[in-house]
Amino acid sequence: MKKNIRRGITTRTTGSKRKGTPRGKGRSVQTIAFGTDGWRGKIAEDYTFDNVRRCTQGFAEYLMSGYSRRDLSRGVVVGGDRRFQSEHFAVAAAEVLAANRIPVHFCGGGVPTPVISFSVKARNAIAAINITASHNPPTDNGFKVRDENGGAVAPDGLKKIEKCIPANAAGIQRVNFQDAVARGLITQFNADEDYISQIKRMVDLEPIKKAGLKIVVDPMWGNGAGWFSRLLTGGKTEIIEIHEERNPIFPEMKRPEPIHPNIDAGLAYAKKAGADVVIFTDGDADRCGFADENGEFLDQLRVYGLLALYLLEVRNMRGAIVKTLSTTSMLESLGKLYDVPVYEVGVGFKFVAPKMIESDAVIGGEESGGYAFRGHVPERDGILAGLFFLDFMVTTRSKPSELLKRLFDKVGAHYYDRIDLVVDAGKKEKVLKRFHTQLPQQVAGLPVVRTNRMDGFKFILPDGSWLLIRFSGTEPLIRVYAEASSRDLLHTILADGEKLVR
């Protein structure tokens, strides 16, 4: 472990003020494990300032082992969301990086994840730390890391970071935030302008402004608040925002995730307002959801199909599509129609981002409403996805329901749903053991023609319908996913899936 004194920097260990007896020294502290998208925990239980500092120290050690001192001088972007104390946890992370002589570009709290990620590229940084629990319940917070491309760190990198995390608080380097600012180790900056310039390069906003649409935006009390208004005001289009204030309790929803029942209040408001379209962004604005002109929710698999169709048909782009195994088979159909490869990877952008870079993909995405695009950063961006969806509507002069019909005319109707079952660790292990010894031969009365064990257990049926059972890496959940060619078949598949894990 590195010493606590670095040349030219006075540092201190986290713990007791009594000299020589730092709190946590010699005491076992919980193991921190990174799931599909970083580390998350309950605030004041396992998600504490000491544990955030431990994570940051581990990340600093990881960076110092892989980069020269010259490259380290490019620095790390640090920001966070609107959750309870996020800006203070971000300060804690910045103090640790600075004490390790890694410069910090600090953008503070309330900054969307895609803005933080793009800042890595804009400021030529080597990485980012993002304090956010994304769509988790209000009791939680989280710690995301991003690489020098602004995308998720690959699984091998995450394992290395975990190994670098000190066993207790005694191994943490710290320097006072204001002292680090005075010494030039921490630079505070506004990340918005670089991102806005990038958005204007990616999509022409003027036709959307002039279209005269009525758009209801629900940022779900999160970081997406104000962004669509800021980008689209100045024309005939009207932007109406709800749930735009900061409120880390997330009233009127269980969590800031754009699925039922969290979207119900937004849908009810949009119907009364007569909206042409509804856009939801999750807590950190990297994921999104949409509802049509009738207030009907468009599930995220259909949205992925629509965004891919928009890029392939309206923009005439060509290139690979990267998808997680939990998202739609409509993408394979589009790949055949437009003669582009489709790559299926494990769940999480830690798998999607590296494959996007490797294949120069046009789009990459997952079933939870996260989509990334060529020419941007290999990171989910709910704001850019929302603007692309609006551009699809305006360019084709179509309502959302008409866009969906256009998609289904090409690939056939698809229906999707997901059930999340809260379980304890013992139940998870029991189900896993059963599946490793005996797999179902039939689902919904249909034979299983193929089983994919890449990430969980995916059972593919003869007509392309599928059931996926997987175990969350960040929450105590078993997730049951299904996609089918009819609603009735979908319900039967889901019911069978739920029985399999009971």
Residue ranges and their predicted role:
Residues 78-82, 217-219, 292, 375, ...:
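Short glycine-centered, acidic/aromatic-flanked micro-motifs in structured strand/loop junctions
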Residues 104-114, 297-300, 322-324, 345-346:
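Active-site nucleophile and cofactor-binding loops and adjacent substrate-binding regions
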Residues 65, 69, 75-140, 230-291:
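N-terminal small/polar loop signature for handling phosphorylated ligands or for N-terminal nucleophile
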Residues 2-5, 17-19, 23-95, 99-100, ...:
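An N-terminal, well-structured beta->alpha segment
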Residues 28-29, 141-273:
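Gly/Ser/Thr-enriched, mixed-charge loops and adjacent short helices
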Residues 276-277, 313, 317-502:
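Phosphate-binding and adjacent anionic-ligand microenvironments
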Residues 37, 78, 116, 129, ...:
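Buried hydrophobic positions in well-ordered alpha/beta secondary-structure cores of metabolic enzymes
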